[in-house]
Structure formats: C-alpha cells, structure tokens
Amino acid sequence: MLWELKKIWYRIYQKVFKVAMCFMDWSEPQLLEGAGSVLKLPEFIKSKGINKVLVVTDKGLMSLNLLDPLFKKLEEVGVEYVVYDGVQPNPTIPNIEECKDMYNQNNCQGIIAFGGGSSMDCAKAAGARVVKPKQSVRAMRGQLKVHKALPPFFAVPTTAGTGSETTVAAVVTDPETHEKNAINDTCLRPKYAVLDPELTVGLPPHITSTTGMDALTHAVEAYIGKSNTKETIKEAEQATKLIFDNIEEAYNNGKDLEARGNMLKGSYLAGRAFTHAYVGYVHAIAHNLGGLYGTPVSYTHLRAHETDSY
C-alpha cells in the first residue's frame, strides 16, 4: 500500500514538473564542431574577455598529453590557465571542494571541463560552489537548488557517452555514504561546448563501446519516458540512429573521424533528449551500483544484472 502511494506521488510530481519545465530557460550550448575545433576554443574564450581559466580534467588524459595542443593555443592567445587533474571516475565531494578552491585561489574567470562525464560533473558542481560559497554540495542535491549562473563554462567531451556537455545535471558521489546523487538545475547546462572527433580517436575499443551504450541508454530511456515530448522523441530517434549506424565502425576503426563525429553528435542529442524527458530504471540502478562499487556508469549500465547487490 505504501509503495502504491509513493508511485502515485512520483507520477504526480513528474506531471507537475513536466508543466513547470515549459517555463524554464533551456538555452542550448553554443557549439564548436568538427575535427580540430578544440583549437578554436582559446580565441573564442579570449573574445569573451576571459584572461584566466581553470581546466578540469583527470590524470589519465594529462598523461596522454591530449591537452597539450589546447594549452599551447591558450598560451598563444594570451589566456592563462591552471589545471585541476584530480577528477575520479565518480567525482566525490572532496574532488569538488579541491576544484572550487583552486578556482578561487587562482582568481580564475572561467572553467574548461575537458574529459568524460566525470570531469564535466566535477567542474559543474565546482562552478556551483564558486557562485554559492555558503551552500554545501549536499545542500545542492535535488532539483533547482543552485539557481545562480555559473562562471563561463566550456565543455570539451573526450568520450561519446554521457552527453554532459548539454545536460543540466552533475552526478556526485558522497564518500561517507557511498551514495550517488544528482544536482539538477538549468544553470548547470554549459553555455559552450566543443564536439571535436579528433579528441576521441585514441579511445580504446572497450571504452568506445561502453560509453556508446551509455549514450544509447540515454536515448532509449528518453524515448520511452513518461515526460517525453515530440522534440525529445525526435532527438532520441536521431541519436539512436547515429549510434546504431556508427558504433561498430568506431569500435573497429577508431581513427574513422566520420564515425567518431557521428557518435559525438549522437551522444549530444541523447543528452538533450534525456535532459527534458528524464532517464529511467537502468540509470537508477547504475547510479546506486556506482556509488557502492565505484564503477563507471557506462560500464554499470551493461553489467547491473550480474551483481549480487540486486
């Protein structure tokens, strides 16, 4: 009986929130697209009057020297940068606090999130802490609790999976409780994003496949969700086709820029779709397992049924 009442409440909440979403700011990111487009980003940043940025990434990408061309271009145009590379596969509250402190201590004026969904989630939450210094990360969890514009935010995905470059969410792990919770607010949606397939050509096949299935999960759950619209259904269909038509080629021939570019676009469209239409049970299970075991959400989507926890 209690569960039935909860279900009714959840459905009412979804219906009310679906109506409320019509009145929110859903401005999409301004995109830089195509091979080599990341090198256009520094001049674009400079044109916004920004002279110093915090680059949020992880040690793995730093060790691959994937950011070196971006760093060189930033130096050429006169934009200073500092690097936070402590992002973990499931960013934690301490990660976010360290990142926020580095931004403030170095008087940065903007944030570049460079990497997968973890880097972008960490950067989003850190940006929220910058503009809301008196509000803890735990207090931001849930719906619409930030409601203040982040510093200028530039998202550069290096995987075609999470779609975080266009979503309003940041998923955070609490190391004390091992829970994963989302901070959801339209102000977390990046204003600018770069879809550069050259940044994904070095992904090993197993990451190409798992992140691609993450994007496909977004598209399917957005398509069948209770809060979908004509627009999200169209975006989900486009995303599904792009992923189906290109994931095998991207897996077998990682240097195929067309396939890589189409996967990035599919991930982006899936991110747009589920931002409006929500995700579903697969994500709910995967986020809980990720909090318990520290597994990346893209991998957990495929393996949830094999774990003892469920």
Pin down the residues of each PLM region.
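An N-terminal, well-structured beta->alpha segment
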Residues: 1-79, 83-84
